[in-house]
């Protein structure tokens, strides 16, 4: 019997880069096949070929034994294939129901029957165990909720082949469990699934088989993971041993650099108060909706401050805009890289230099292109940013390399004082994480106060000098590195009455 999906010697070349070279593996009906590899290894490129976004240069894709060409996303969908990319695709001003039924809304005489659409979507969401308001507009939903909409869209199309690219990167523990149940149900229903994740726990929990990519090549395939140690997968992914991904080392701390006192914003239920010292890394942990990102955006001037006070190096700090924050040496690497972090149509060099340009104007008026080129080349080499050259459009880089470019932007700032990192390694592979942690430590050694928001508890525990836990829009507690462990942090993060054991 033919495999539900087969990749046969797939090749893809971009200018200056061989993105895929000789990729061959099968996915059976009723199987979850994991794909692992560093950012830029070619995993997402393969899914874009499967989804009709890119055209392959060599090889073939077979669905149920038939060779297929997907000149468009519509052709892929018509063949029973659904690809859910890490960078979500939705219409922000349409409702959940309208996004889910886009292109096939029920109508009569040319008029869309919205009530019928909403009822149908509510029934299907309930059957899938997903708690979403069918009438809510997508722009009002969290990133986690938008991701669930994309997953539900594939299920509503009854796709027989489903590819998921980092589907849990923004999901809460509860939402992740809902997704896992859906994946298990789809496997039992005989669907073929491709599952890309950098999270080892997910790969071992869900996947029947696994293929490893490195630098566009297929370096290993495992028909079963039952007897494959995690260390083997890491070594195959990165081509080297990584014994301690966090490589934490204590450092000398300076005086208090950033102080928040009774800070309030539209999404913060109680005044938030905390300090961060020069050279200190303070991790902020909390469940989805705890208010961490909202607090960071208030500090950065991206959201309105309704009360409380900020101080920088002991002096009152009045920030009314993000421009004010940057001028005072406070920067933010946002959670949503695509929408808020990068300038997608600009080059890697332009993205790195976009903030520090004001320091390097010739005669106070003209851009110093030579200086910008040297700055970009220096950080591309220092941070090992995978790009053909500094002129490459940043949108063509992997998520991990885009994040490195954003960090390079702030490393190039001469007067940096506070760095806020919101989910700095979301959707990034283990090798790139290792390198990004090194950048964070380097910023701390320079005397920057580092505030790191992360939903990955091992990361918070592994990198932070101190941990602040948020719950339901307020600070629930604080733990020193020496007293912090998973149970202690979760007991602060969970709603009152729940315990870490219950989670």
From Swiss-Prot:
ABC transporter domain boundaries: 5-240, 253-497
Binding site for ATP: 37-44
Catalysed reactions listed for this entry: L-arabinose(out) + ATP + H2O = L-arabinose(in) + ADP + phosphate + H(+)
Keywords for the protein's UniProt record, in alphabetical order: ATP-binding, Cell inner membrane, Cell membrane, Membrane, Nucleotide-binding, Repeat, Sugar transport, Translocase, Transport
Any Pfam family hit: ABC_tran
Cellular component, GO annotation: plasma membrane
Entry-linked Gene3D superfamilies: P-loop containing nucleotide triphosphate hydrolases
UniProt GO MF annotations: ABC-type L-arabinose transporter activity; ATP binding; ATP hydrolysis activity
Subcellular location: Cell inner membrane
Top-level taxonomic group: Bacteria
Membrane topology: Peripheral membrane protein
Transport as UniProt keyword: yes
Assembly information from the UniProt record: The complex is composed of two ATP-binding proteins (AraG), two transmembrane proteins (AraH) and a solute-binding protein (AraF).
Family that this chain belongs to: Belongs to the ABC transporter superfamily. Arabinose importer (TC 3.A.1.2.2) family.
NCBIfam families: PRK11288.1 (NF008442)
Identification of the protein by name: Arabinose import ATP-binding protein AraG
Source organism: Burkholderia mallei (strain ATCC 23344)
